[in-house]
């Protein structure tokens, strides 16, 4: 399978894929198949700005699981799979599941609040918002080790620096150009939600680790069965990675060199990720 402890990820036949990442891919694919072969459109689960006022809590928490078509699903999975797998291997399977729920709901509330004024009839679905959130989360942490992603030398006296912290915004603009029907607001709120995660502003919304450990103990038989085909990253093991070890940079680079760069280039900014917006039904 893929070794997500390295970047770019490398194929390792001895590894099984992360449980949550694999399950999300399979589950959303099945939903896409159901939508394609039946007349059910999941209309009630499209996120519209009025969802909080209408108390449509299902759309606020589940809109990201559904897609317009297979192409939309493939694009989102291609964007999300690697960062989600990296996050899961470092933070634990259940912790990652809680994170996805928090990112989904927080981004949805931002989208709805602003949308009531600027795009009241525009709905969104899809996983790209979460993808942009994880992108911004990683961009924030990567910026501590590699503040500048790339420097473009336009002439002897002119150069443009692409700061790692701003990469998600660049990606969002590129998506807007390549896919005009995509939701720029959705992507931007995915990015801001990723920053909230990065700066620790939503940490208090997580359940205590003891609760997660208790759940894992009660589901131990099911977890042992799943580990025949996937890797389940348990809370006790992941606490070490999240706590004492800290963030491990994706790109191979000397940490002291990265720290020196960070000091010389000043403070960091924001990063993030999301997806599609349209007239009546957009893709996030």
UniProtKB/Swiss-Prot annotation:
GO terms for cellular component: Golgi membrane; nuclear periphery. It is an enzyme of class 3 (hydrolase). It is found in: Golgi apparatus membrane; Golgi apparatus, cis-Golgi network membrane. The active site is at residues 128, 187. One of its GO terms (biological process) is proteolysis. It is a multi-pass membrane protein. Keywords: Golgi apparatus, Hydrolase, Membrane, Protease, Serine protease, Transmembrane, Transmembrane helix. The keyword Repeat does not apply. It catalyses: Cleaves type-1 transmembrane domains using a catalytic dyad composed of serine and histidine that are contributed by different transmembrane domains. GO terms for molecular function: serine-type endopeptidase activity. Belongs to the peptidase S54 family. This is Rhomboid-type serine protease 2. It comes from Candida albicans (strain SC5314 / ATCC MYA-2876) (Yeast).
